[in-house]
Amino acid sequence: MDYIDKKLLLFLGRENFLKIKDYPKFYKKVWLTLLKIPEGEVRTYKWVAQKIGCPKAARAVGKALKENPLPVIIPCHRVIKSSGEIGGYSLGVRKKIALLKKEGVKIKI
């Protein structure tokens, strides 16, 4: 088990970790970064890409978010477009907006 897997196991617990253990390492790096975004704050796909050391991989970050098997636990709803637009969400944009509002994020529609 490598460092990223150990950190994800620590953050998610065994049951949730088992749901993601076979995904690509890139996805796991993205998801670990998402777990560090504080509730009530948002970041961009580009920011996440830069944080994981792949500054040109914003689209690949979006793909990792789309494949997130634990979309509320691993908070991909906290990632938005650089333009400030909400962007997509596997559970639907309405759900993403509701989650962000619940966390205190001001949403411009």
Label the predicted regions:
Residues 72-80:
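Short Lys/Arg-enriched helix C-cap and helix-to-coil transition segments
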